[in-house]
Amino acid sequence: MVEAALAEPDEVLNGYCRIEDEAAYRDPSVPKAVVAPDGRLLYMSRGPVPASKGGTFRMAWRQVCIYAFPRVALRAFAVHGVKSRLEDIEDIEILRFLEMGWTVRMVLLSDTSIPVDDPADVERVLAAIRSRGL
């Protein structure tokens, strides 16, 4: 992320990685990213997106909550003050940037991170740390 931020200092950046299992794809605590071929974020949802007509899991991307922002973008975010409409529905703050007209560039990251969205996730992190002898 640091390299991407240095290369694109005027861009709003957000990390993402591939979802490998269907359970994560269907889990509403995992924000799913819909990314254009050029790396722009098209949408992010807690719902299963992209979704096939038949409802089968094919592939998806998840948000890795690592960001880089230019100062002007953070200022605009703060001045906006309240959650935007979609941000409020999905509870995903990066959607505020999309609704304000910012382009969000997604940075592909390792899928080895463990998201911590609720207290039960802390044990998964501790187990991973112990398994590495740290």
Language-model segments: residues:
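Conserved core of the sugar-phosphate nucleotidyltransferase
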Residues: 1-83
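Conserved alpha/beta core of the MobA/IspD/sugar-nucleotide pyrophosphorylase nucleotidyltransferase superfamily
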Residues: 56-134
